[in-house]
Structure formats: structure tokens, C-alpha cells
Amino acid sequence: MKASISIDEKKDFIRWFLNKHQMKTREAMWVLNYIAGHDQIVKYVHFVDNLEGCARGLSLSAHGVESEPFLFFKGNIMTTDPEKAFHDIRLNWDEELYVELHFEEAITSPEYALVREDNPFTAVKLADEEKEMADALIYQSVHQFSREKVLQQIDEALDARDEVTFHKLVRILQQMDTVKE
């Protein structure tokens, strides 16, 4: 997760984007200009790779890519009408707005990378190998913690000169070490 992206960084990106790319609809340009002109709105804007799971999103496309020119959705309602989107953005300026931009070379754009954030609603997908590594790390951590706890209890049993507890804990420690191997 990257650090918070400043309002100025987002505004600079929008200006760069509009200077570099021609939107498929002029209304998309108007909406982006409106957003960039209002810090209180920019504060709630998040640029993401996909809008999956987002409660409120705006998908905009520049010429040169195969995707819808303009989509706005809030909850289960989706529209291609820029006026409805503009109206919602203007009235609900203090709600999170996730923006997905489609343009040539978006994936390799350093400017876009600076403002792009992880979609907090998208589940992280791990490969089987990564899951196995995570499971092994968790198992190892729990084992190490448990072993240290038993060693601490052995020290306490020695300090208390409690032979019965000491021998019981040594057997537990030996079993733990056998299972680990």
C-alpha cells in the first residue's frame, strides 16, 4: 500500500492527463476539469485499475483504447449520462469517488503510477505457491512463539525448583522439536 497521495499530485496528474490524451467524450474532460478545480472533491478521488466492488465509480476512456467512453455508477445504478454523474459529484463531493482511466500505455505510464492506488474492495488473489509460503510462515511463527513460551515456563519452573513441572515442560519441548523436524 502506498502512502497517501496529495491533492496537488492528483490535480497535477489530471492536468497532465488532459493535456496528453483526448477523451472520447468532451463531457469526460469537463468532469475531470471540474474535479481538478475543487480540492474538496479531489481529496476523495482515488485512481484505481478497476472499479470492482467500489460503491461509487467513474470509468473514462481516451481515444485509442477499446472501452466505454463514459460510465458512472453509484451502488447498483449505472449511467452513461455525464450530466447525472456531474450532478452526483457536485452534490456528494464528500463521498469517495473511484476513477478508472483507460488510455494508451496506462500500465507503463509513470505519471499514472504516481497517483494510482490499490482498490480496497478487491480481494488479494494469491497463487498456490504464495499461499503455501504464507501458511509455512504462519506455522513457523506460531511454533517459534510456542517454543519460546515453553522455554520461559521451564525457566520459571527451575527458579521455583518445581521438578515435576520442569520435567513435564521438557517433554513438551522435546515433542515440539520432534514435530518440527
Swiss-Prot record:
Belongs to the UPF0302 family. InterPro entries: IDEAL_dom, UPF0302, UPF0302_N, UPF0302_N_sf, Virus_scaffolding_prot_C. It comes from the Bacteria. This is UPF0302 protein LMHCC_0635. HAMAP family: UPF0302 (MF_00760). Pfam families: IDEAL, UPF0302.
